[in-house]
């Protein structure tokens, strides 16, 4: 069944199935993320899901809504999943709990629940954490080939809950790669290094050892791309938003890179690093907070792509997907107003 707009307000069964399909489509990306960055992401997702179900159940109870029926729509689980995989794998446990509470209680239920929220709940929770705890939110481990210390499941669990592995290493020590240099994400490394080095020298660093983009990150993005194509094939999402998002981001990156290759990242680095594919197929396509008309979706997706590029290049944050999505959410009523198909026989009011 093809859904044109906000299906969550009128068909409980289709909502549950679509949410479950989106969750399953995340699996290829989660597998890649777990392989390159450890088991922490799985632990974060589990903590987020438990918190989301408890928080949503409590609020529904207070609102005297049918708790079990509403929880079974899987929307809380999907919000928790998207937030959990967006956080650094070894972020402290209280961060994912706080972010999930904010996403479910404030960004979703405060507006009336599923189908009423004007902003993407997972991205609201993410941005709150990023602004409040910037150091912890940028503490990503090096990808597996560059890790100086391998972090197993037990050490991941210990670090998330205590801040230390069984051998006493903290997150800052774990961030040091095999070469003794503290590692960052490809986008963060490129943005920071541009202050003192040209692009061709920056790209010689080990973190950029991937064929398409950053080492490890390219496979995470490919995983979410595979899942996104599955959603398109099953018609769970429309093609307009991801295609216009990726074309706008890739186009801006290509033009700037061709003009000044020593000062701008390549289109491939933008498309296959950070949260690009996750944002294009799983976050921006949220039918509640996105535009609902075909032309509107194209404008909405392109706006997000342009904003992501602007934030990555000129902003204070290395990625920018979350901020771009929330800023675009603000424009949805205006976009929908001017892109609604004209009713047959409609005449303008002027004489």
From Swiss-Prot:
The chain crosses the membrane at residues 18-38, 40-60, 87-107, 121-141, 211-231, 241-261, 264-284, 298-318, 320-340. It is found in: Cell inner membrane. One of its GO terms (cellular component) is plasma membrane. Its cofactor is FMN. Its main location: membrane. The keyword Transferase does not apply. It is a multi-pass membrane protein. The modification FMN phosphoryl threonine is found at residue 185. Keywords: Cell inner membrane, Cell membrane, Electron transport, Flavoprotein, FMN, Membrane, Phosphoprotein, Translocase, Transmembrane, Transmembrane helix, Transport. GO terms for biological process: electron transport chain; transmembrane transport. Its EC number is 7.-.-.-. HAMAP family: RsxD_RnfD. PANTHER family: ELECTRON TRANSPORT COMPLEX PROTEIN RNFD, ION-TRANSLOCATING OXIDOREDUCTASE COMPLEX SUBUNIT D. Part of a membrane-bound complex that couples electron transfer with translocation of ions across the membrane. Belongs to the NqrB/RnfD family. The complex is composed of six subunits: RnfA, RnfB, RnfC, RnfD, RnfE and RnfG. This is Ion-translocating oxidoreductase complex subunit D. The lineage of its organism: Bacteria, Pseudomonadati, Pseudomonadota, Gammaproteobacteria, Enterobacterales. The gene is rnfD.
């Amino acid at each position: 069944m093809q859904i044109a707009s906000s299906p969550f307000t009128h068909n409980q069964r289709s909502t549950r199935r679509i949410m479950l399909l989106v969750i399953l489509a995340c699996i290829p990306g989660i597998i890649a993320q777990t392989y390159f960055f450890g088991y922490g992401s799985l632990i974060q997702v589990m903590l987020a899901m438990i918190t989301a179900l408890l928080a949503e159940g409590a609020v529904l109870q207070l609102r005297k809504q049918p708790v079990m029926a509403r929880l079974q729509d899987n929307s809380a689980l999907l919000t928790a999943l998207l937030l959990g995989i967006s956080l650094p794998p070894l972020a402290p446990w209280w961060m994912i709990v706080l972010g999930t509470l904010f996403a479910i209680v404030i960004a979703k239920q405060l507006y009336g629940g599923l189908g009423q929220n004007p902003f993407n709940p997972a991205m609201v929770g993410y941005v709150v954490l990023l602004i409040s705890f910037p150091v912890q939110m940028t503490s990503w481990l090096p990808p597996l080939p560059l890790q100086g210390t391998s972090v197993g499941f037990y050490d991941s669990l210990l670090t998330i809950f205590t801040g230390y592995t069984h051998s006493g290493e903290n997150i800052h020590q774990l961030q040091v790669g095999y070469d003794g240099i503290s590692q960052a994400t490809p986008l963060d490394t490129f943005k920071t290094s541009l202050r003192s080095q040209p692009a061709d020298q920056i790209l010689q660093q080990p973190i950029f050892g991937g064929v398409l983009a950053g080492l490890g990150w390219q496979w995470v993005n490919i995983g979410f791309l595979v899942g996104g194509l599955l959603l398109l094939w099953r018609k769970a999402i429309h093609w307009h938003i991801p295609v216009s998002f990726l074309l706008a981001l890739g186009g801006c990156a290509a033009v700037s890179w061709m003009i000044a290759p020593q000062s701008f990242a390549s289109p491939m680095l933008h498309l296959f690093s950070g949260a690009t594919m996750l944002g294009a197929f799983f976050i921006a396509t949220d039918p509640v907070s996105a535009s609902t008309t075909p032309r509107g979706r194209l404008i909405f997706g392109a706006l997000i792509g342009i904003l992501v590029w602007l934030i990555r290049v000129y902003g204070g944050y290395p990625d920018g997907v979350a901020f771009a999505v929330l800023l675009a959410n603000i424009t949805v009523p205006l976009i929908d107003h001017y892109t609604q198909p004209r009713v047959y026989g409609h005449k303008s009011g002027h004489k």
